[in-house]
C-alpha cells in the first residue's frame, strides 16, 4: 500500500514539474497556437460574396494567417466617405482596403497609404499588369500605392436577337447603328443604350473619344470634338434614349436585359448580372468586338485594388497577403475561385483559366489599347462638372464652340 502511494505521488510530481520541453508546453494556454498566427483585417467590396469567403479561407490555410473581412458600404458615395474617414483618422483597426480607381486617384495624394514598390509591386511583379494603367492610376511620384486584383474592361455588348432582326451579324460601324434603329418595332427600343447620369457619363464620353482617336484632355483636337458631336447626333436622331440621363449602370443593364437596347458599352463585371438573368449566350446578349470607328482601337479599363493603410499595426501580415494576391499563384486562385477576371494579364492569357467569355477578353487584350479612365485627385468634381457641360451641349442648351471651350477649361482646372 505504501509503495502504491509513493508511485502515485511520484507520478503527480512528474506531471506538475514536467521534463524537458513538456513542462514549457503545459504552461501555454490552449489557444496559444492561434495567437502565434499573424492577424489581418480587410475591408472588402466582396465581403458578402460566398466565393470571396472561400478564397479567404484558402488563403488563410496557404499563409497560416487569421483573416477578418469587414464589409464596405454598397453605395459608392457612402463607401468612399467611410473609407476616407478611416484613412484620414489614422484608424488602426483596418489593415487592407479594397478601392476602385476613383478612390485611389484621391487617396494616393493624401499620405494615407503605404508605398508598395519595394516589397510587393516589384519591377518583376509590376510587369505582369497593364503598364499604362499602373502609371496613370496606381502610381504617384515614383511610388506604387495599390495592388490591382480584379480587372474590368469596357466591352461592347450586343443583343444578338435584335441584330438578327435587323439582318446584321455584328455592328461594324456607325451605319450599322442606323440600320439597327430602323429595324426596331417599339418606340421605347433604341439601337444604343447608355448611362448618362452625372457620375457615369464620363465613362462613355472618354470611351467615344477613344473610338475617334481623340484625346479627352485636349478639346481643341478635331477627333475629340467629332466624338462629342456623334454622341449628340445619336440623341438627336433617336438612336439612343433621353431617359438615360438619369440612368446608372444598374438601370441600363435592366433595360438591356428587357430588350430595350440593341447594344451597350459596359464593363466585364456585368457578365454575372446577365448570367443570373439567363440572357447571356451567343444568340442572346454577349460580348462582341469593338465597332471600327477609327483606325486606333482602344477601350477603357478599371480595376479593384488593395491598399495598405499607413496606420496599420499588422503591416508584416498585410505585405505577406499582398505578395500572395499580387503573385501568379494567388491571382490564379482568385480567378478560379471567384470566376472573375484577374488584373494580371499573364494569368488571363493562361490557357488553364477557363472563365465565361475569356476568349473575347483575350482578344481585347491582344488587339486593343487599354486606357485608364481620365481621373484626378478631385475626380468627383471633375466628373460632375464635365457632365453638366455635356448634358447642356447634347440637349442643345449651349452652343458647340462654347461647350468645347468650357470642356477644355474644366480639364485645365482639375488636371
Identify the role of each PLM range.
Residues 28, 101-154, 178, 186, ...:
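Hinge/lid segment of periplasmic solute-binding proteins
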Residues 34, 285-288, 335-388, 392:
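Long, aromatic- and glycine/proline-rich binding clefts that accommodate carbohydrate-like moieties
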Residues 63-73, 91-93, 167, 233-248, ...:
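A local structural motif
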Residues 72-82, 102, 174-176, 244-257:
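Short helix-initiation/N-cap motifs at beta->coil->alpha
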Residues 95-98, 262-267:
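Paired acidic/hydrophobic, glycine-rich loop segments that form the ligand-binding mouth/hinge
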Amino acid at each position: 500500500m505504501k509503495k502504491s502511494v509513493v508511485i502515485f505521488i511520484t507520478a503527480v510530481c512528474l506531471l506538475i514539474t514536467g521534463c524537458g520541453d513538456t513542462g514549457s508546453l503545459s504552461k501555454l494556454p490552449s489557444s496559444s497556437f492561434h495567437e502565434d498566427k499573424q492577424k489581418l483585417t480587410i475591408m472588402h467590396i466582396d465581403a458578402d460574396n460566398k466565393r470571396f469567403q472561400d478564397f479567404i479561407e484558402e488563403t488563410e490555410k496557404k499563409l497560416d494567417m487569421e483573416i477578418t473581412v469587414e464589409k464596405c458600404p454598397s453605395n459608392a458615395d457612402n463607401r468612399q466617405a467611410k473609407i476616407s474617414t478611416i484613412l484620414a483618422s489614422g484608424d488602426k483597426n483596418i489593415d487592407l482596403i479594397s478601392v476602385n480607381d476613383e478612390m485611389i486617384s484621391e487617396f494616393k495624394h493624401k499620405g494615407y497609404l503605404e508605398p508598395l514598390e519595394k516589397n510587393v509591386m516589384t519591377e518583376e511583379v509590376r510587369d505582369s499588369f497593364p503598364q499604362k494603367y499602373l502609371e496613370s492610376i496606381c502610381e504617384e511620384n515614383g511610388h506604387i500605392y495599390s495592388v490591382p486584383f480584379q480587372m474590368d474592361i469596357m466591352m461592347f455588348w450586343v443583343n444578338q436577337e435584335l441584330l438578327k432582326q435587323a439582318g446584321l451579324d455584328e455592328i461594324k460601324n456607325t451605319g450599322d447603328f442606323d440600320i439597327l434603329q430602323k429595324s426596331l418595332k417599339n418606340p421605347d427600343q433604341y439601337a444604343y443604350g447608355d448611362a448618362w447620369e452625372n457620375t457615369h457619363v464620363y465613362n462613355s464620353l472618354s470611351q467615344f473619344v477613344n473610338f475617334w482617336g481623340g484625346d479627352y484632355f485636349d478639346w481643341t483636337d478635331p477627333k475629340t470634338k467629332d466624338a462629342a458631336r456623334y454622341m449628340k447626333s445619336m440623341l438627336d436622331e433617336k438612336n439612343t434614349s433621353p431617359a438615360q440621363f438619369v440612368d446608372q449602370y444598374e438601370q441600363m443593364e435592366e433595360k438591356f436585359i428587357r430588350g430595350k437596347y440593341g447594344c451597350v458599352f459596359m464593363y466585364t463585371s456585368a457578365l454575372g448580372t446577365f448570367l443570373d438573368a439567363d440572357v447571356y449566350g451567343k444568340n442572346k446578349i454577349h460580348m462582341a468586338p469593338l465597332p471600327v470607328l477609327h483606325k486606333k482601337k482602344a477601350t477603357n479599363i478599371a480595376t479593384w485594388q488593395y491598399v495598405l493603410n499607413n496606420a496599420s499595426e499588422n503591416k508584416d501580415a498585410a505585405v505577406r497577403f499582398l505578395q500572395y494576391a499580387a503573385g501568379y499563384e494567388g491571382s490564379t486562385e482568385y480567378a478560379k475561385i471567384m470566376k472573375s477576371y484577374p488584373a494580371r494579364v499573364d494569368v488571363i492569357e493562361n490557357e488553364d483559366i477557363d472563365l465565361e467569355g475569356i476568349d473575347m477578353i483575350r482578344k481585347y487584350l491582344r488587339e486593343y489599347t487599354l486606357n485608364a479612365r481620365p481621373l484626378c485627385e478631385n475626380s468627383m468634381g471633375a466628373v460632375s462638372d464635365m457632365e453638366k457641360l455635356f448634358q447642356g451641349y447634347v440637349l442643345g442648351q449651349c452652343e458647340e464652340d462654347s461647350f468645347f471651350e468650357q470642356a477644355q477649361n474644366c480639364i485645365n482646372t482639375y488636371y
